[in-house]
Amino acid sequence: MAEEIKSFEDLKDVAAPAALQQKREPKRDAQGRSYATGRRKDAVARVWIKAGSGRITVNGRELENYFPRPVLRMVINQPFVVTNTTNQFDVVCTVTGGGLSGQAGALRHGISRALTYFDPDMRPALKAEGFMTRDPRTVERKKYGRAKARRSFQFSKR
């Protein structure tokens, strides 16, 4: 580099490499769908989205039938609310492993990733809300000499 950068103001003036300035291309298959995988705890969600009327199908069942708790449905719809695309995409997904809460989190992660593949301009909004990051928290393993991961057996003084 011929120019020497001494401050952050100088850094702004330097142009970013051409590879970073390229616009991301949408990833869609022949049917116009975008595919992504979402994970949370032990749950894995395979998600396909396409432009549609807002219908969400989970393992061949409607969203309201598969996730009866309103909180879980709210978690799943968060990516659409953040990107202002409610009722604009049809979602077909298969979810395996874990419980309902983990599956809902995996579905949210998968929908967020699929939305960014469908339209890369949605990525900053989803990333700012933290939907693009896989939640690393999992169940802590049980240790020997203990009742559970951290719970000790009852102590008897005598």
Curated annotation (Swiss-Prot):
Question: Could you confirm whether the keyword Transport appears in this record?
Answer: no
From the UniProt entry, list the residue stretches annotated as the region Disordered. 16-37
Q: Where is the composition biased (Basic and acidic residues)?
A: 22-31
Give one GO molecular function term: RNA binding
Q: Which key words tag this protein in UniProt?
A: Ribonucleoprotein, Ribosomal protein
Keyword flag Lipid metabolism: no
Q: List the disulfide bonds.
A: none
Full protein name = Small ribosomal subunit protein uS9
